[in-house]
Amino acid sequence: MKDLLKFLKQQNKTKEFDGIKIGLASPEMVRSWSFGEVKKPETINYRTFKPEREGLFCARIFGPIKDYECLCGKYKRLKHRGVICEKCGVEVTQSKVRRDRMGHIELASPVAHIWFLKSLPSRIGLMLDMTLRDIERILYFESFVVVEPGMTDLERRQILLEEEYLDMLEQWGDEFEAVMGAEAIFSLLKQLDLDHEIAEMREELGTTNSETKRKKLTKRLKLVESFHQSSNKPEWMILTVLPVLPPDLRPLVPLDGGRFATSDLNDLYRRVINRNNRLKRLLDLAAPDIIVRNEKRMLQESVDALLDNGRRGRAITGSNKRPLKSLADMIKGKQGRFRQNLLGKRVDYSGRSVITVGPTLRLHQCGLPKKMALELFKPFVYGKLEALGLATTIKAAKKLVDREGGEVWDILEGVIREHPVLLNRAPTLHRLGIQAFEPVLIEGKAIQLHPLVCAAYNADFDGDQMAVHVPLTIEAQLEARTLMMSTNNILSPANGEPIIVPSQDVVLGLYYMTRSKINSLGEDMWFQSAKEAEKAYRAGAVGLQAIVKVRMKQVHIADDKSRTETTNIIETTVGRAILSLIMPEGLPFELVDLPMGKKQISTALNACYRLLGIKHTVIFADQLMYTGFEYATLSGASVCIDDMVIPTTKKTLVEAAEAEVQEIHEQFQAGLVTAGERYNKVIDIWASANEQVAKAMMENLSKDTVVNSKGEEVQQDSFNSVYMMADSGARGSAAQIRQLAGMRGLMAKPDGSIIETPITANFREGLNVLQYFISTHGARKGLADTALKTANSGYLTRRLVDIAQDLVITEKDCGSEDGLLVTPLIQGGDVVEALRERVLGRVVAQDIIKPGTKGEVLIARNVLLDEKLCDLIEEASVDQVWVRSVITCQTDFGACAQCYGRDLARGHMVGQGEAIGVMAAQSIGEPGTQLTMRTFHIGGAASRAASENNIQVKNTGKIKLHNAKFVINSEQKVVVTSRSTELTIIDKLGRTKENHRLPYGAVLEKQDGAEITSGEIIANWDPHTHPIITEVEGTVQFLDFIEGLSITKQADEFTGLSSTVIIDPAQRPNAGKELRPMVKLVDPQGNDLFIPGTDVAAQYALAANAIVSLEDGAKVRVGDAVARIPQESSKTRDITGGLPRVADLFEARTPKDAAILAEVSGTLAFGKETKGKRRLVITQANGEAYEEMVPKWRHLNIFEGEKIEKGEVISDGPESPHDILRLRGISPVANYITNEVQEVYRLQGVKINDKHIEVIVNQMLRKGTITDNGDSAFLVGEQAEVARVVIENRRLVAEGKAIATFDYQLLGITKASLATESFISAASFQETTRVLTEAAVAGKCDQLHGLKENVIVGRLIPAGTGFAHHRARAAAKAAELAPKVEETIVDTGTAEQNLADLLNAVDFGD
């Protein structure tokens, strides 16, 4: 009983804790954990197999081997528990204490802890302000260090070599003290006066000017302060006592054949003990210094190896040449403690088997093999057998079950009814990878899976396996049923669209039955109901695709749930009429009155969910599936070789292309085109030939000519099986059919470049040997890619989950007024993503004003936009909306529901406790395997787009120019003179229809604000040269134009005109290196002219290779080109695509040759140049100048004297997200990352809601750099959690003190995960050693806010159903801490009664 009480008491102790603190262990602490000192390296006696006394497995120290039995066997049984045997000294207790009793080793000489020594930055080095190199020399006995200078002229911490030390000894005698080894470091650390050090450093920080010194001081100050605050003492980084792990955690297992398998730790401990004992003996014998030193060094090395083998020097290896696994290796990596045992555990009550199709199942069911079910539900069956009296004991029940009699199966049926099981398919990439189903018992050994959930599991039936888990407790069953049931997971959390969508054969069947066929049996018949039409079809009186008239009854359900019935006669087909029979009431017939491809089916299911709710949708989906299977069977669609019709025009098209190629080759031979041009042109020719063949083939396949009932020939969609499969979306695509019946087209070489000769054959004709060989590369690459992709995609998901795991919805509304501005996504003349798709399910941040009114509010702020409101927005032609976003949410920890908006998987406002972070990570990571791995070489076909030279508009409307600088030339046309000009076309309702970037020097046909009709060409420019445009009228004057030094004259072969070319400075003779050729504009009197509106002279510096076609003294008008700079034909840049691009964006990597943005607003000028760089000087409005050095090879977009805005592009290139954040702010960087990531997914046809990407961006912006610390404890330049700074500032404001200011910092996902507040979460992610070292030194306390930390300590997570539990715990704790007032008055009677009750309740046993 006592044991039980003790046990219960212990249980309570560990349960209630609010945080986990990590720190350095002091020697006293290690001794207090220990149950005795391990003195001998022996493990167990080889004859008796009993543990040796005082050895590594000693029973005296660590506890008995067998339960309640001492080693010598004097005391056995439970009644002796707690007795310590006087003979062998072993306490009689449970043997499991050997898992938690520790021992210790008293080290004969102190030893430095390798983590604090070698884990960079070295903590010991920082504390002592010495270099790691020096410290190692002291530790490993190469030099002395002065610990007590005394009255000498030596400095404390000065390093002395052996000879120097001897000299000093002669000079000063024993006035000073210098030591080597860990003792020296120990005494130096012990001497540190932290308060004094901190004061000194703070003072120095105020006075120092050098940046490097300040950085170094800040680092050291943070470390010393964290020691000061955390009650860790610096000298504890040196070990004097070494703890010994409990023996059952480093077991010694007997193998058969009398050998033993042992944990590597035992070897490592043995080494330490051996060397320690030898050192003790040597010290007792007063051995020569050099021997003792060597032994001490060896001891240091063996302790290093025990703690972290291989960190310093060569790893110690065991007998089989494999490095021994040290304590650090035990916890880090995929196989370490964190990831193997704490985050991922194996569970009981589970089984796995192959899956097969269950076409007859309902959506909420799965087929479970009887054998498996019996095994999984055994305990329940036993219980039921006893309850029914069929078995008296568990043993008897067991016998019955083993016999597998009839009554057992009946009972199993009863047990299983209404008891859901979880089905999981690895890899579980998103939360739909585990769903709950009700089991149905089946014969056989394979699990049956409902076909509609295959998409969510990404399962197919080619041998996939799935695992079954049984939720045991009633709570678990409830959760499985209400949250995880497959019927509750109809919408995908990634984009809010149905994921339970029929595919493949079902789609084909539905498509086949909803197609119409001209002149089919029974055309133009009239039916009084859909039922009658079905009857006629079953009787064979009418064909399935016949066009007939049917009387349809339709129910319309209004918003207020009122129903109106309408009956009318509709012309439709028999198949669609039959399909209408399975539609739920209230769904409009228009949804199925068309050929049902995959898209249309999805639309119908979506509409059903929004109109009628979840129950009807599930039934409808099931019925669709049954019907689809039935009619797919009836259709008899199959593929035969004649279905792949080769177009007759193919031969002529190929021949024409070959002739063109021949012509190009002849031109190349004659030297008229370069090799590169020939290559590009040939590839263009073949690409377009391929397109034409494909087009001819599709036209041929998709239409049939038939005779209608009137005897006329008409075209109808073909019933060719191959075409039907592709058209319905069941299987295959136009691109694949092209390879079957068109031509295979161009192939790539292994290095990614395209081979000039295409494969003109297709698979139906067959390939010859060469063609086959060329195409093998593609097949091989596909397989290699897939393998790489899976690993990389998994790693991306892991990093995303890790950064976002602690983001949970914690409150209803944070009251934030901020948000992001959302506009439709338009590229060129196409709307890529309409506004409604981007704002659906978001909350409005600022009132939406109806366009064209003076402030009539269309939708007020804080309203959730649903489908109806989005229709309203579209009708009113709103073209931008401010929506709330997680990024601007002001909740301290977590986010609020209003800023997140709709829960995509449920279709209503998100609830509290929803783990939006993990959901976002899964939604982005799950499609990762569909993305490509390769980088694209843009060459050939793609580079044509780069050299466009005009803009042709596709819509009618008004022109609007944004951030445009332009001049009007002599012909009254607009000439653009800035680089970031955008031209948008706006329709009558004020909606943006298209937008285009205009290059510098483009000539516009119309002015800003002019009307334009579609098809007009509005802007022209020369794509091959870059003009320099004048902004004033005047006379040209050349400066620094010296022939042969800075310029050369060239005459054009064709025209005979001469032009001046500027020589590249690198190629000029030395005399010309410093010349800066310029064109200057002067008035007729020779005075300088100024650029209008400024006092900057109108002079244009000319870049290398610029061509000037004017003569000195020529007159120029506004908008003329003074010079032209030839553009390199746009080089084929590799575009990083697919997965690597997404990873780069989330890691916030600065791209190579990033764009240079203006740091301040002002006027630009050039300062003095250095060897490889130019000096840009931007003069601000207040006269301050900002300087920046730019490499000379960078092509600048801006001329001297131009005004630029902060954040404007000075030199082109990919923009760096860090620059965007610094110069333009949070909203633009969020938009940039969101759009760029979406771009990659859009190319693959994957839809992900913007919200998810914003959630990740929000987590990347968690940290800020302190710019001014005000009255706070932060240091300037320190990186701090934004939430902490905000909370601290709130406190400072309340106290009327100065607040701290900070700049947001964008961290990549790996960096941000490692920089989380929670050290447990960071350590379980990556770089375990570094994270734990840092945390221990700082004495960090993990508050257990996130999900990962709680999983690791074995609690419910603070999300989902665990959220309420944590809330309740917090509330209870607050109530406990609240000052108790009334309860103090207790009358003695009740107190006595309570005490008596308590005493009676507890039975103290013997």
Swiss-Prot record:
GO terms for cellular component: DNA-directed RNA polymerase complex. It catalyses: RNA(n) + a ribonucleoside 5'-triphosphate = RNA(n+1) + diphosphate. Keywords: DNA-directed RNA polymerase, Magnesium, Metal-binding, Nucleotidyltransferase, Transcription, Transferase, Zinc. Pfam families: RNA_pol_Rpb1_1 (PF04997), RNA_pol_Rpb1_2 (PF00623), RNA_pol_Rpb1_3 (PF04983), RNA_pol_Rpb1_4 (PF05000), RNA_pol_Rpb1_5 (PF04998). Binds 1 Mg(2+) ion per subunit. The keyword Metal-binding applies. Its cofactor is Mg(2+); Zn(2+). It is an enzyme of class 2 (transferase). One of its GO terms (molecular function) is DNA binding. Mg(2+) binds at D460, D462, D464. Zn(2+) 2 binds at C814, C889, C896, C899. InterPro entries: DNA-dir_RpoC_beta_prime (IPR045867), DNA-dir_RpoC_beta_prime_bact (IPR012754), RNA_pol_asu (IPR000722), RNA_pol_N (IPR006592), RNA_pol_Rpb1_1 (IPR007080), RNA_pol_Rpb1_3 (IPR007066), RNA_pol_Rpb1_3_sf (IPR042102), RNA_pol_Rpb1_4 (IPR007083). Zn(2+) 1 binds at C70, C72, C85, C88. Gene3D superfamilies: 1.10.132.30, 1.10.150.390, 1.10.1790.20, 1.10.40.90, 2.40.40.20, 2.40.50.100, RNA polymerase II, clamp domain, RNA polymerase Rpb1, domain 3. GO terms for biological process: DNA-templated transcription. Belongs to the RNA polymerase beta' chain family. DNA-dependent RNA polymerase catalyzes the transcription of DNA into RNA using the four ribonucleoside triphosphates as substrates. PANTHER family: DNA-DIRECTED RNA POLYMERASE (PTHR19376), DNA-DIRECTED RNA POLYMERASE SUBUNIT BETA (PTHR19376:SF54). The RNAP catalytic core consists of 2 alpha, 1 beta, 1 beta' and 1 omega subunit. When a sigma factor is associated with the core the holoenzyme is formed, which can initiate transcription. This is DNA-directed RNA polymerase subunit beta'. It comes from Psychromonas ingrahamii (strain DSM 17664 / CCUG 51855 / 37). The lineage of its organism: Bacteria, Pseudomonadati, Pseudomonadota, Gammaproteobacteria, Alteromonadales.
